[in-house]
């Protein structure tokens, strides 16, 4: 994951994604990380995964697609820490969130403000960046 300021990469984080990361999240329980443009819309200090920032999924288009398919789009997608400690970033293990280490999450929370846009996209060559 890249943290970009004024068009320049200022930080790079190794990440873990949903257990089935390739492809856009469509419904609750699909273990996919949503792809597209969202907003980091609030901070959660009491996360079970250390600390977290909420991603504004589902957006209007996500809700419309889920309705068309007759499914629940899910929600509560976060960028969060790596607690519990038995989870590792070498494998994708989340239920659709983006996980970084706890120390990196502390840094991320200090650097990133509520209201910051986030663009999530899958790339084969950088599947864990």
Model-derived features with residue positions:
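Electropositive
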Residues: 10-39
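Exported/periplasmic cell-wall-interacting domains
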Residues: 37, 42-129
């Amino acid at each position: 994951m890249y943290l970009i300021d004024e068009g320049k990469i200022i930080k790079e984080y190794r990440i873990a994604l949903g257990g089935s990361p390739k492809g856009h999240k469509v419904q609750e329980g699909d273990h996919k990380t949503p792809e597209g443009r969202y907003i980091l819309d609030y901070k959660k200090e009491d996360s079970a995964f250390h600390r977290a920032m909420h991603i504004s999924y589902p957006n209007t288009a996500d809700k419309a697609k889920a309705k068309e398919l007759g499914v629940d789009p899910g929600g509560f997608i976060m960028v969060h820490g790596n607690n519990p400690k038995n989870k590792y970033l070498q494998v994708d293990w989340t239920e659709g969130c983006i996980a970084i280490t706890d120390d990196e999450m502390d840094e991320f929370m200090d650097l990133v403000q509520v209201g910051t846009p986030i663009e999530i996209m899958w790339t084969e060559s950088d599947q864990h960046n």
